[in-house]
Amino acid sequence: MNGVSGSDGGIGPVRPASTAAGAGPLRIVRLANFVAPASGGLRTALRELGKGYRAAGHEPVLIVPGERESDRWTEQGRVITLPGPLLPGTGGYRVLTDRRRVARLLEELAPDRLEVSDRTTLRWTGKWARRARVPAVMVSHETADGVLRTWGVPEGAARRAADALNLRTAHTYARVVCTTEFAEREFVRIGARNVVRAPLGVDLVERHPALYDAGLRARHAREDQTLVVLCTRLSVEKRPGTALEALEALLRRGARAVLVVAGDGPLRPRLEQRARERGLPVTFLGHVSDRGALGALQASADVCLAPGPAETFGLAALEAMACGTPVVASASSALPEVIGAAGATAADRGEAFADAVQNLLRRPLAARREAARARAECFGWRTAVDAFLKAHDATASVPAPVTAPVPPFVPGGLG
């Protein structure tokens, strides 16, 4: 091939795309921008969907930007990395900018389906797919108007810009996949008729209440303190500062609380400075790459916060709930739809989040943890994979895996 190589010897033989919808195994080529080693939700979704496509008998291929080119076989299928420049001010995000190289790679791969997880810089691939007669879907991971508002764009201007962007997206792709009704609204608003719903999911075996670690909790909080956890990328659209404001409000009210932040991003230095200047008990862990360690932290918390107002699903919040930990989420996001009555929502202010935390912790410990886990069990990855394959007019060819029993949660000092 031209430019992409690896230990497996390049792209391999080109084969013609299938002509019948969902006929036999499909080569599903997936493209994603704005990924980084320390990014969380998108990388998790890409990995789990790829694993699910493989298990269903299909051939997933993922193309992402990176520091250098590589071509690897992984649990999620083939992963091809093309060199992409760093995006300034994003804390490590890279983008695919060489259109000719990406187009050439797509031609060599000869996909049966194309799945794009970037609605801006990769939108041109929808036109490529039309010319190549390859059915293509775009996955909406964040609302356009929501992101624009978090960047300070006035609401009216953000809505007009989002509508224009979404019209072009809907016209370019065969289908637009939205993970929640919340995400779907901005496309319904413009009259798009090619929108389908497909939720994301959570690994209910990897994330479970038995990950609770009394020793880990004791390292971060005393027995009489509330352990609040924030698992998110520290960037503007995620609004991590709301968590610090909520902690400060709780402390003013006399509550004993500490905050542990798992995540990295461009706002980290500013947040650390704010915590120091205000004397807030905040621990910044940075990016936690060990998924077991992150799960133990989520399971050992009293409550997890999800303050991002533009979230269209909220994987980190769902993972916390699978661990038996309730979530307080932004009422402006899709999270109310995901967490249901098992968590709480709040306006995008620290005081409101503090209110929600205190109200949530008034519920009996066992009841709130059982409710969180039960709600998460509605969102297994098998359901998500089936929905995404349906959006591709693809079929699953293997039975659902048997879920291993989850050990019960044993309370130990929370409350």
Where are these regions (language model features)?
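Nucleotide-activated donor-binding/catalytic signature segment of Leloir-type glycosyltransferases, i.e.
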Residues: 269-288
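Conserved acidic donor-binding segment of nucleotide-sugar-dependent glycosyltransferases
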Residues: 340-351, 358-365
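Aromatic "clamp/platform" in nucleotide-sugar-dependent glycosyltransferases that forms part
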Residues: 309
